[in-house]
Amino acid sequence: MLLVDGYNVIYATPRYLELADEPRADSLDHDPFFRAREVLVGDVAAFAQGRFDPVIVYDGAGNLDPERLDLSRAGVRLVFSRTGESADSVIEGMATRERAAGRRVTVITSDLAVQATVRGDGVTRLSSASLVHEVETSIEDSAVELADRSHGRMTVADRLSPEA
């Protein structure tokens, strides 16, 4: 399982923080973190693909709907903590349950208290910056691969599988 401390990653890295809007006093239903969360979901989905069961945990306090149900987007489970509960405690609880069940867990957060709490056998800890570095490296590698492919000419025979 991959557990991501959502707002910690957003606040700790310019990649996502730059996507956050200023809160608007004229609109109570404006969500300043919508774009940042959407990009984070896409990045986590790409990072986790085929390797992890990804979960992003957000603090529910202060959200427009503090009783949000668990959601899923692009194969990533989104969990908002309940009113009065922190995302940190949700992450700690999920990591403890996974570890007790003998499953490996990777926790992404730059919160040192969370990192210390989830430390133990079967738990890998990565900083928020490490996730962003991995995502940006993957994007760069994909761009290079795409550019390399676009420079070569392909014939119909090149596109056919040898078994055909």
Spans of features found by a protein language model:
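Nuclease catalytic cores that cleave nucleic-acid phosphodiester bonds
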Residues: 2-4, 8-164
